[in-house]
Amino acid sequence: MIYRELSQAEFNDLASRILYEDNHLLVVNKKVGEIVQGDKTSDEPLTETYKAFIAQRDAKPGQVFMGLPHRLDRPVSGIVVLAKTSKALERLNAMFRDSDVHKFYWALVCAEPRPAEGSSLSVGFGECPHTPLSLNSFFNK
């Protein structure tokens, strides 16, 4: 399969967003506004973008496998785990299905939110840029 050629700037951006990689996994930082899998829009999903990246970086002439065991919505930023092999995808799917993966979500807001009755809220400190809400999802085992 022939993948599109990435510009040097896009290639460098994608490379800088890799948090972890081995023969089985690719863990990347997803930006707000990106989609992780195809939808009815013509936007290229992150899975296809990283297939093109791997093909170009490794000069791989054949098809690149990139499985998606979980998703993050378009308006969300955070960590996405991609499977580079079908066996890794199978195992990751089982981990998500069996709740062996723990997800953590953080929201950045400009005003101090009030927790709903019966819930808890941890408030941190930091600068508040006037940008849309951004959520981060972090995974660990």
Which residues does each predicted region cover?
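RNA pseudouridine synthases
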Residues: 1-141
